[in-house]
Each structure stands twice: as structure tokens, then as C-alpha cells.
Amino acid sequence: MSIPAFTVVIPARLASTRLPNKPLADIGGHPMIVRVAERAHASSAQRTVVATDAPAVAEACAAHGIDAVLTRADHPSGTDRLAEVAAQLALPDDAIVVNVQGDEPLIDPQLIDDVAMHLAHHADCAIATAAHALHDVAEVFNPNVVKVVCDAGGRALYFSRAPIPWSRDDWAGVPAVPASAAQVPLPAMPVLRHIGLYAYRAGFLRRFPTMAAAPLEQTEALEQLRAMWHGERIAVLETAAAPAPGVDTAADLERVRALWAQGMAQEGP
């Protein structure tokens, strides 16, 4: 199967608690949101659109020839924002929309293509996403690292901040919250870390805002659990390696700037 037609939507908000004005942070002479859009343009997407509630972000995009749409500021989640964009663009129900986070300036364009293709290959699923095996046990027990377990067909069974699956034999005697993960072995069965890249069918995006919030979604603070609670299937693409780091904090921004500078230096004469 050839790569399906798809649209990339990049949500971008200025109101970040840990890094204010994050979409406009400079990376190599351009705002971060522009760098993310450049990576999306390098994929096979037919169109890339930035979705923002901030005129300053829309203006920065326009200055660099990037499509942007203004959305409401009161959306409870990024998926709700995507639903508004899908409606504004009048996308048909079977159209594929890939949600690329606005703080991923180093995202691999091939991964964007792969997730879109994965959804196209799973006609029974409304959503596709990605995951990779963890090799650091500290990340297994880190609640900020979301884990996913899948069925035999690679469809998500559950997402959690807890270490899942719990390896009874490998972790015999290990408390659920160990004082230190340094002495805890990696289990025989791989633990998969969820990668926050999603492909959706536009019809699902139209349904999502009408779905009642789910207790599991609220408990784990993971909006994909709302979809699963209401019976939607999620296809999970397992990748061989972790993606490039995103930007959540000022320290992350400096690290990405350094990586970007190294890449630009390697490309130079």
C-alpha cells in the first residue's frame, strides 16, 4: 500500500506553565513552531496546518509561509482542538489527520509517515500511535513516562503511568513504588513507552468532543483513555528506537538548541 493522503495538524499554545511562549522560542534563527512545521513539510503530508489560539503564533507562521488557523482558547484537550480544525477544513470522515506536537522540532518525518500508514493499514481502528521498548528501568517506574500494553494484533489494551505489565516473577519482592529503581531488573517482557504522536480519522475527531469524560482518563490524566473507554480501537506501531527529545522545560530547549546546532554544523561546508 502506498502512503495514504493525510493532513498534519500542529497544535500550539502560548500558555505553557513550564516554558512560557514556547512555540515562539528561537531555535537556529526561527521560532520553534516553524521548525516543527518544517519537519512536517518534510513528510509525505498533503498539507500542514498549525492550530493555535494565539494571534502571535499565527503571525509567526504567516511570516514563514506556513498555514495557520485560529481556534477557540477554551478547548479542554489537544484532541478537542484538532476536532475544531477538522471541521474548519471540512475534512471527510475517512480523512487521516496526524497530530504532531508543537514542541517536537526534531521529530522524524518518516515517523509521521509511518503512523499515518499504520492507521491506513488498520481499518478497524480510529486512531494509530507509536511506542518503543524501554531499556532504562528508571523510566519504567517514572509516572511521567506513559506505558502501553497491546494485544496480539498490536492494538492498545491500556495506557498507564504505572509500570505495566507488572512482571510478577522478575519483580518478586519489589514494591509498587521502589525507593530506587537502580537495583530493579528489566523484565523479560519488554515495557513499551508511548510516543505522543497520533493519527486520527476525521470522523473520530468529530465524535470525540461529544464523548463524556471517562473516569480512567481523569485518574491517569491521559485523554486517549477516553477514546478507549468509549470503545474506540487504537493501533500501536512499535518502533525500533526512541524518538528525538521534545521540549518541555528550559533545559530541554537548551539541549535541543545544541542538537540543532550540531546538525546544522554537520550539514555545513
Swiss-Prot record:
Entry GO MF terms: 3-deoxy-manno-octulosonate cytidylyltransferase activity
Pathway the protein takes part in: Nucleotide-sugar biosynthesis; CMP-3-deoxy-D-manno-octulosonate biosynthesis; CMP-3-deoxy-D-manno-octulosonate from 3-deoxy-D-manno-octulosonate and CTP: step 1/1; Bacterial outer membrane biogenesis; lipopolysaccharide biosynthesis
Origin: domain of life: Bacteria
GO cellular component, one term: cytosol
Disulfide feature: none
A Pfam family annotated for this UniProt entry: CTP_transf_3
Subcellular localization(s) per the UniProt record: Cytoplasm
EC number: 2.7.7.38
Function: Activates KDO (a required 8-carbon sugar) for incorporation into bacterial lipopolysaccharide in Gram-negative bacteria.
Family to which this protein belongs: Belongs to the KdsB family.
Name recorded for this polypeptide: 3-deoxy-manno-octulosonate cytidylyltransferase
Organism listed in the record: Cupriavidus pinatubonensis (strain JMP 134 / LMG 1197) (Cupriavidus necator (strain JMP 134))
Gene name, Swiss-Prot/TrEMBL: kdsB
